[in-house]
Amino acid sequence: MKKTVLITGATSGIGEACARRFARGGYQLLLTGRNEEKLDALRKELEDAGAVVKTLVFDVRDREAATTAVDSLWEGSFAEGGFEGVDVLINNAGLALGLEKEYQGSYNDWDTMIDTNIKGLLTMTRVVVPRMVERGCGHIINIGSVAGDAAYANGNVYCATKAAVKALSDGLRIDLAETPLRVTNVKPGLVETNFSVTRFHGDKQRADNVYNGIKPLTGDDIADVCFYAAEAPAHVQIAEVLVLATHQANGTVIHRETK
């Protein structure tokens, strides 16, 4: 029986890269996101390559929608096709918005980051993990960030949400220590995706400046790390992985080449 991976935020960036990597690795895919058109396009691409894919359209901030969508997996054609449960949950959905001083930030940006990066992750964990415990198998991979290790200038709330991801990952690992389930916190540094465009509310020039003078990581690099962790032997729990671009030392020290 093929393993099944559920990936949140699968329509772009690290989530989309994880979908392709796990498809190549022979997994069945449950892909979630807010953009139905992008999900359908990715599903078609992966199905054409031979993967088994089901898409679920919802926002992880909507607890009722997330719960209903996940519960539906145990009904209908997908269940009839041999679906036994989620083997790997990749809590990828997340974002940064704005880069202002803490006393000048946008309330709306704060709410969106907290509701997505923390509450959304908690919702998916609460909905999926009990069934993993019942089955006696499963792996939760949370996409954290180097930003969760220490705050950087004007990153305040985003850094706080990723620090929360670390704490939640560590706490869940403790809660599951008596089970065969594993928990991994993957902490990327600079990854060139649509992350910075989103942070700067569509200002591509400002987003591009984030990566000037350094070769950043790609979504594929992080997807490879996630796949490696998921495929490790059952007795091996890769608890935490910090992945940085070669010229990035931590969240604040980056050497940039100048022309």
Each language-model region and where it sits:
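Conserved glycine-rich cofactor-binding loop
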Residues: 11-12
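Conserved glycine-rich Rossmann-like NAD(P)H-binding loop of the short-chain dehydrogenase/reductase
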Residues: 27-41
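The beta1-alpha1 cofactor-binding region of Rossmann-like NAD(H)/NADP(H)-dependent oxidoreductases
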Residues: 37, 57-71, 107
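Substrate-binding pocket helix/loop in short-chain dehydrogenase/reductase
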Residues: 100-102, 106-114
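Active-site helix of classical SDR
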Residues: 125, 161
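Residue(s) in the substrate-gating loop at a strand-loop-helix junction
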Residues: 145
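C-terminal helical subdomain
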Residues: 185-189, 205-252
